[in-house]
Amino acid sequence: MTEHMRIPLAGVIGSPIAHSRSPALHGYWLKRYGLKGHYIPMDVAQADLREVLAAMPRMGFVGCNVTIPHKETVIALADIVTDRAALIGAANTLIFRKDGKIHADNTDGAGFTANLRQNAPDWQPQAAPAVVWGAGGAARAVIAALIEVGVPEIRLSNRSRARADALRSDFGAKVQVFDWVQAGNILEDATTVVNTTSLGMIGKPDFRVPLDALSPKAVVTDLVYTPLRTRLLAEAEAAGCRTVDGLGMLLHQAAPGFERWFGVRPEVDEDTRAAVLAT
């Protein structure tokens, strides 16, 4: 098959992978824009990752998304790593270049910002401190994005203080670390509040941080999207806050990769959201 006739392949690699909504999302976009291409979920064990990445370009893959547990590991296996992926320490989007090199990027932070700007258009992140709960890979992406949009101070709280301290050492003085017992006390005057933990997800412990100090001017977002309306979002809404669920971040972070692989920048709109929720 000649190069111009080849139908591009992309996919998502992780383990487990059955839960991923990415195949439904990319499949919807391919159909919506009438594009030739396929997007394939692949359950790849950690021990097989290097071999699989080496084989994918030969099989016709132009790139792939990366999810748990490989997002950190692929950084070491890539030939080119963007500055933001290096800062975050993880990649979620790979491009297999024609020269044989693997290009690694992280679009999670951009997806986070785009989701808030779309669903809370009056969001003014530079106006007041932000609160971030959690200190894993998602928190790193969110903090990098918040610094980029000009948040003056980030109050970080995590169940493991050591992980939060390590994150502060990477991102600098804008990040202030607080013990988990203070997670509710640090809300005063914050206008951006983000849960990056798995608390509140189906099958996980509930999110139980007191919100008494929460300002009704705050935009509150939860990266958990199963369920869409978490306990945190329900309580924040009851307190008069604008709330944004986590599904939009998933949709927006996927758009740059789709554009690179299939040549069209897809829209993230209500039709996109409905198509993914229907699966």
Swiss-Prot record:
- Active site, per annotation: K71
The record's similarity note reads: Belongs to the shikimate dehydrogenase family.
Pathway per the UniProt entry? Metabolic intermediate biosynthesis; chorismate biosynthesis; chorismate from D-erythrose 4-phosphate and phosphoenolpyruvate: step 4/7
Q: Which reaction does it catalyse?
A: shikimate + NADP(+) = 3-dehydroshikimate + NADPH + H(+)
Gene designation:
aroE
Q: Which UniProt keywords apply?
A: Amino-acid biosynthesis, Aromatic amino acid biosynthesis, NADP, Oxidoreductase
> Which residues does the annotation say bind shikimate?
S20, R21, S22, T67, N92, D108, Y225
Q: Which GO terms describe its cellular component?
A: cytosol
Q: What is this protein called?
A: Shikimate dehydrogenase (NADP(+))
Q: Pfam families given for it?
A: SDH_C (PF18317), Shikimate_DH (PF01488), Shikimate_dh_N (PF08501)
InterPro entries, alphabetized: Aminoacid_DH-like_N_sf (IPR046346), NAD(P)-bd_dom_sf (IPR036291), SDH_C (IPR041121), Shikimate_DH (IPR011342), Shikimate_DH-bd_N (IPR013708), Shikimate_DH_fam (IPR022893), Shikm_DH/Glu-tRNA_Rdtase (IPR006151)
The organism's lineage is:
Bacteria, Pseudomonadati, Pseudomonadota, Alphaproteobacteria, Rhodobacterales
Report which superkingdom the organism of origin falls in: Bacteria
Indicate the secretion signal residues: none
What is a single molecular function from GO for this protein? shikimate 3-dehydrogenase (NADP+) activity
Which EC number(s) are documented for this chain? 1.1.1.25
Q: What does this protein do?
A: Involved in the biosynthesis of the chorismate, which leads to the biosynthesis of aromatic amino acids. Catalyzes the reversible NADPH linked reduction of 3-dehydroshikimate (DHSA) to yield shikimate (SA).
